[in-house]
Amino acid sequence: MVRRTGWGGSRRQRGRWGDLGPSSVPLLPMALPLPASPCRGTGGRRISVFSLSPAPRTRSCSSSVFPPASGSPCLVIQEAGASQTPHNVLPTPTTPSTQAHPTMIHTSASPSWGSHSTPPLASATPPPSCPRPQDHPGLRMGPLIPEQDYERLEDCDPEGSQDSPIHGEDHQPLLHVPEGLRGSWHHIQNLDSFFTKIYSYHQRNGFACILLEDVFQLGQFIFIVTFTTFLLRCVDYNVLFNNQPKNHTRRGPLHSKVTLSDAILPSAQCAEKIHDSPLLVFLLVLAAGFWLFQLLRSVCNLFSYWDIQVFYREALHIPPEELSSVPWAEVQSRLLELQRSGGLCVQPRPLTELDVHHRILRYTNYQVALANKGLLPARCPLPWGSSAAFLSRGLALNVDLLLFRGPFSLFRGGWELPEAYKRSDLRGVLANRWRRTVLLLAAVNLALSPLVLAWQVLHAFYSHVELLRREPGAFGARRWSRLARLQLRHFNELPHELRARLGRAYRPAAAFLRAAEPPAPLRALLARQLVFFSGALFAALLVLTIYDEDVLAVEHVLTTMTALGVTATVARSFIPEEQCQGRSSQLLLQAALAHMHYLPEEPGATGARASSYWQMAQLLQYRAVSLLEELLSPLLTPLFLLFWFRPRALEIIDFFHHFTVDVAGVGDICSFALMDVKRHGHPQWLSEGQTEASLSQRAEDGKTELSLMRFSLAHPQWQPPGHSSKFLGHLRGRVQQDAAAWGAPSTRSPPTPGVLSDCTSPLPEAFLANLLVNPRPPQRDLSPTAPCPAAATASLLASISRMVQDPSCVSPGGTGGQKLTQLPELVSAEMSLHAIYLHQLHQQQQQELWGEASASSPSRPWSSPSQPGSPDEEKPSWSSDGSSPASSPRQQWGTQRAQNLFPKGFQENTDTQKEPLTGPLH
């Protein structure tokens, strides 16, 4: 694991934003009291620590103490890297330095716990002539890239230093805080929480909407509890159902009618019935305690969001009334510009779009990587050989508590993974401890399951019964599952970007499911007959009620009409739609794939058509199935914790050990989130020759390559690192090469004439949909399985890339606002074509590999788990030294793995529990 030292400081300090995250540097000046003798420039001006010049660097693992120049109040401590050319975060003066040579004080290097570790911070002793005061608790600095020199500036103000020139002052720009930008954001101690709340404030539409949303949620909880108690203890159902005479009589012609007031018990009698039930009183006390906890948390969050509103208004110059018209990209751009101008002093410097995404999506990127490696979601084998994925809201909350935010989790809600998880000799001890934590959490879930189940039933009853009465067909509609939002998500993709992409993919994906559904003529025949008979009975009762409304007073007539309507609606959903018959399911799948970008493999599915259908069906599931999963979640969550996650404790510990890196200025993040093609690329996704990843280190389904492409298109100002930039250049070159091979525009027109050539398409998304669903037949012999060949896609991709680079080509004659609105749509269309292009190249490469394998060994089955077809299919190892036999669950998955998930019902697999304890836990 690559160990990168971040900006140091105390890691357990707390402030407004919680735990002290890495690289939190308070702005100077600030409202908090500063240590004595601060650094000052000429005229008593306070200067930023970033305006000071760096000291010379050394390659030895020692610390260098630089005596300051006359009047220089700063002490510099330096650490040298061992393997990379050092870079410095501070600006270098253009003229030679006049500082005295440093005095080297050698220290012994600390022991290394792995080949990728770096020594801890070197110690230094200040000169006797310049005593070093204690650092301010908020001042935290460090390197920007791994294994490089860094400098820490200490306050040391000798007498008369305020009027002395600072070294490099004549050559370096002074970064200072403008007088009008002084607020609570100048002393940020948890940048993860700060950036996350900035994003959440924008997505939740400002402080007023956040306040009302929290108030309504608290009020909804009170309503559900009080109304349910009222229905249980304060209503006389014998009077309401007219089974006994009412409590009092009323004069007049309507004296025999039962009113609601007749069935409601008096308040004293209602309170007495509540007191007579100790269980109900206990549940009400629990509900009151939970409500008070939610109220306290909401109040604390509202104070934080009020500060965020002030930050938006004063620092970003976005008033609340204009927030809805400002996209997130503009907010992020202003945030980065504010940091570059010195108004927000955080590290790394300069702040990039990727740094912001790393902090907002620190835990989410881990979850996406866990899903990519097969550890999420939980799966259960089905009797017919396939498997069912399960990831309810309750299970996702428990996973979050186990791994990230719980008191006994790996991260414990912070930005740093403890050092013990980065040591390979403690993996067995940590796995056993995590198993005990899972067992404890499963026991708590099992104990609370009756209460949670009752709450789920009540909430579903109050939320969906009206919809069932008014529109029963809504439960037959499909919606993206929680599994889809996890498996189809790119690394570093924000929630609103994912929602927009899946929203564009919904219609073609739903059409594909209707077109590719396996034929079931008998089921359709029975459904038609059921619709006819239930509809006939419903029509007869409806006519009778129209003729005489007293028919509704007959017992169970209204209930019968409701049941008949629901039955007809449900049965009609099993009848195939005529408009979907005859449409090519392959074209619809390609149109959906253009926006989904992924179609993860379904374990145990056989046949290409059946596999694609069941994959999509689990991603885009019925609303009724989703509701049923949430209702059963309190009962199934403890079982999956015990029999899915607990046996995989060692694999999960190994995952965090091998796929965690410490990025300077950011903290510990998932290594997949760096989108490093060299480390996590896949040779079958155009990374051949550019990646050094072993089989267990590769991201499946081209996740690294597609995530890198999406992020680079969405953030054109972002500069990718060397290997990633090389991959993007190679991809652009391959696109140009295939586009040239397809033919020049003068001799071969695009599949949709006039859309790309004259730039008259008002909506790029409409163009893309027309292209994918109605492609022009290719003019050369191509595989019938590729309706839009790679060369044709490359030609279109090259054309639309020119449109993105030339905004004047978008909607000629339109206003500037219209052009800016259409540019993101063009970028989305370009990314869709990139996804199709990469999938086509991947398919071609797989076909070539299959052809070579069948030619060399025609008698050997390619996908046999016991006989791998290529060296790459050998069983991978998660450990670089070969000490761990655990392999990637995604690679292990097969028929044998599926059969051993829950042998004999729900029995625990103890294979991973036999790992010996190799070292004590410190």
Swiss-Prot record:
Copy the domain comment: Forms a homotrimer with a solvated central pore, which is connected laterally to the cytosol through the cavity within each protomer. Acts as a lipid scramblase that uses its central pore to function: the central pore opens laterally to accommodate lipid headgroups, thereby enabling lipid flipping and redistribution of lipids added to the outer leaflet of ATG9B-containing vesicles, thereby enabling growth into autophagosomes. The tyrosine-based sorting signal motif, also named YXX-psi motif, promotes interaction with the AP-4 complex.
Q: Which family does it belong to?
A: Belongs to the ATG9 family.
Q: Which residues lie within the membrane without crossing it?
A: 438-458, 625-645
Q: Which organism is it from?
A: Mus musculus (Mouse)
Which residues point to the Cytoplasmic side? 1-206, 297-437, 459-523, 572-624, 646-922
Q: What reaction(s) does this enzyme catalyze?
A: a 1,2-diacyl-sn-glycero-3-phosphocholine(in) = a 1,2-diacyl-sn-glycero-3-phosphocholine(out); a 1,2-diacyl-sn-glycero-3-phospho-L-serine(in) = a 1,2-diacyl-sn-glycero-3-phospho-L-serine(out); a 1,2-diacyl-sn-glycero-3-phosphoethanolamine(in) = a 1,2-diacyl-sn-glycero-3-phosphoethanolamine(out)
Q: Name one GO molecular function term.
A: phospholipid scramblase activity
Please report, in chain numbering, the residue ranges of the motif Tyrosine-based sorting signal: 150-153
Keyword Transport part of the UniProt annotation: yes
Q: What is this protein called?
A: Autophagy-related protein 9B
